[in-house]
Amino acid sequence: MFPKNGSKVPEIRFAGFSGEWEQRKLGDVFKYEQPQRYIVNSTEYDDSYDVPVLTAGKSFILGYTNETIGVKNASPESPVLIFDDFTTSSHCVEFPFKVKSSAMKILTLNRESDNIHCAFNVLQNIGYVPVNHERHWISIFSEFNVLMPKTSDEQERIGSFFKKIENLINLQQRKAEKLKQFKQSMLHNMFV
């Protein structure tokens, strides 16, 4: 689905698309925002609160806050990426949120014609593994050359494809979590 090293044309492609992809720096694909104005004041989280507090790491949602000032207003119509500046992990966010720390960048697209879900998968496809505990976006990631489809139609098709797969994965993970909770409940009720 993405061109291999040295090639500008992917081996697997949706029907109706042809031609080379264009090489761009990630810093030209994305602009970044420092998250300081969205940092949560209190770490007294409660699941009954409305605003999720995010980290770009594996845990993603740390909890929920009742703070309503300084909320980043992402939405399905205006999604953003959060990029952990130290681990380089990232997530696509389509809902309002606050953040835990300044150790991330909030990424948005430079071009309105680009598709954020396609660009997110390009970012996810970078095979970089951090070796030092240092910030990575400005000095390293923004300088990476990546290949992007030239047309917004192809970007949309790729982004939509991977978003559907991600939605299915999330659905299955929620089902698995409910089954684990059911199992724990049954074990507790049967053996206590």
Regions from the language model: what does each represent?
Residues W21, K25-L26, V53-L54, K72, ...:
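Non-catalytic beta-sheet/beta-sandwich ligand-binding modules that flank or precede catalytic cores
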Residues F17, M104-N110, Y128-V129, S139-E156, ...:
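Proline-centric
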Residues T55-N121, Y128-S142:
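A short beta-sheet element
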Residues A15, E44-D46, H136-I140, K180:
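Short amphipathic alpha-helical segments embedded in low-complexity Lys/Glu-rich regions
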Residues M1-D28, M148-V192:
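Amphipathic alpha-helical coiled-coil/heptad-repeat segments
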Residues R13-R37, S48-K58:
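Non-catalytic DNA-recognition/assembly elements of restriction-modification systems
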Residues P10-I12, S102-K105, I140-F144, I165-N167:
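Short amphipathic alpha-helical segments
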Residues D28-K31, V71, P76-I82, I106, ...:
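C-terminal accessory/regulatory regions appended to core domains
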